[in-house]
Amino acid sequence: MTDASYLSPAKINLFLHITSKRADGYHNLQTLFQLLDFCDEIRFSLRDDGQINRIKGNEDIVAEDDLLIKSARALKKYSNSSLGVDISIDKKIPAGGGLGGGSSNAATVLLALNELWQLNLDRQTLADIGLTLGADVPVFVFGRSAWAQGIGEILEPINLPQYYYLVVSINKHISTAEIFSHKALTMTPVQRKIADFSRLSDLHNDCLDAAISLQNEIKQALKHLDSTANHLDNARMTGTGCCVFVAFEKEKDALVAKKQLPEQWFGFVAQAINTSPA
């Protein structure tokens, strides 16, 4: 039996512009994915009987719906590997907060089992498999902070400043489907180029108004972060919510701000990274 452990990082969207709605119901977007050094840890024990089992995970999700299992089964189906695996996860990334935890977990499973099952598939193939599981999976498969277009799968790696981020969860959840079907969802139809975002200050998240209308506490969290000392820019929401974040140049300032959070919220400080540890 082979045992191995892999990290699965969180991400934030430094901005998220919805450019159009597609005929298939998905939305085209432009965004900057920033990876963080705040990670789940996933452990793998290989099996020679072909079975895929979840030993430890989110008990609120049945195993068949868990991206840990779905990604392993998708890879097994594609590769026809005779091997199996037992999977366990130690979760740190808040679920359903726009931090990409589930997508990151799926990507880490694909990357890990590609190695452990000795499949030798390239990352583009793994990303194509990942895209069938979720639009954010490919960015974690390629493992780079990136400028993204399409539904999030057209990626251009980019090196971003390695700031420290205070990320706050209000411990509430909004489904992505609720956001994208909400009447308050805004759009930014003008296509921008990646160079524009080095000089424009109008970075925003088109999902914010819809999210606030569903969970007004997001607005309170943004206001609180904007009141902290020594932060670099306006606080923003990541993904479709509900987590919000603000950047600091110095870790100590982020840690001071974390101590000032209301006790009903969960917060963590993480540094931006441009390459995934997965």
How would you name each of these model-derived features?
Residues 241-244:
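Conserved glycine-rich beta-strand-loop-beta hairpin in the small C-terminal domain of fold type I
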Residues 73, 108-114, 128-131:
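A broadly conserved amphipathic alpha-helix scaffold signal in soluble, globular proteins
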Residues 1-96, 115, 119-124, 151, ...:
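ATP-binding N-lobe of GHMP and related small-molecule kinases
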Residues 48-61, 109, 131, 196-204:
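Short, basic/glycine-rich phosphate-binding loops at helix/coil junctions
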Residues 97-123, 139:
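DPxDG-like acidic metal-binding loop motif
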Residues 2-8, 13-31, 119-234, 247-278:
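ATP-dependent small-molecule kinase catalytic core of the GHMP/sugar-kinase superfamily
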Residues 91, 97, 101, 250:
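Active-site acidic-Proline motif in GNAT/NAT acetyltransferases
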